[in-house]
Amino acid sequence: MKIADARAVITGGASGLGLAVARHLTTAGGRVTLLDVQEGPGQAAAASLGGNAAFAKCDVTSEEEVNAAMEAARAGMGSINFLVNCAGVIGAGRVLGKNGPMAGDFFTRVVHINLIGTFLCDKAAAAIMQHNTSGPDGERGVIVHTSSVAAYEGQIGQAAYAATKAGVAGMTLPIARELAMFGIRVCSIAPGIFGTPMLSAMPPEIQDSLGKQVPFPARLGRPEEFAAVVQTIFEVAYLNGECIRLDGAIRMQPK
């Protein structure tokens, strides 16, 4: 499939990697529906992208909201053949912190957003994609997960985050194998240190220090580079069931 033919749902589309993907796709002629729990920023993001973008408010931890948002996206775009899961939270916290052990509710919240939210979006999108007219190789749709290098080298304070991102990477292959019968591919991207709004708010010297930890190129990853890999996954039909590290060869230290 070509990116101009994308009818994409992008979770976490109001900012960061999700917005970068949306901008990349619409610039190439694709259509997108942004899903985000932040209504104001989500509507503003969609408006900034022009007529090929729409917004639907959605909490990815709610199965009812996810199903409704997917149906609204299908109705608005005519079909869905691409899902890019970017919604997530960092969820930094120590198991034994200064104020005592981590609250179970904190860990559960991170799991619900990062892992269960991704799964709920996967199954809702796949239920729609399975009815698409098949293209070359019988393809009907593509799903992309956002994992993280923390899935492989989680740092101190990342127990919840690393667990969820490892779960996202871990379910990629079994879901890809299951959905193969419907002509739906599934891949994950595990980004390293990227220049997202959270990092951009840090002092320049901190950003430079983080960038210098990357072997090559010695800088923060650019959201546009993440978006370019998303396009590659969509267009290269033989990419399936894989988790791609996008990290400049960095291997995270314990802290």
Predicted regions mapped to residue ranges:
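C-terminal substrate-recognition "lid" of short-chain dehydrogenase/reductases
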Residues: 2, 222-246, 251
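Canonical Rossmann dinucleotide-binding motif of NAD(H)/NADP(H)-dependent dehydrogenases/reductases
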Residues: 2-33
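Conserved mid-core segment of classical short-chain dehydrogenase/reductases
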Residues: 67, 90-108, 131-137, 157-160, ...
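Catalytic Tyr-X3-Lys loop
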Residues: 89, 100-120, 144, 168
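Active-site helix of classical SDR
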Residues: 122, 164
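Alpha-helical segment proximal to the catalytic Tyr-Lys
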Residues: 127, 176-178
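Residue(s) in the substrate-gating loop at a strand-loop-helix junction
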Residues: 148
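Short, small/polar-rich loop/turn modules that mediate ligand/substrate recognition or access, typified
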Residues: 180, 185, 239-242
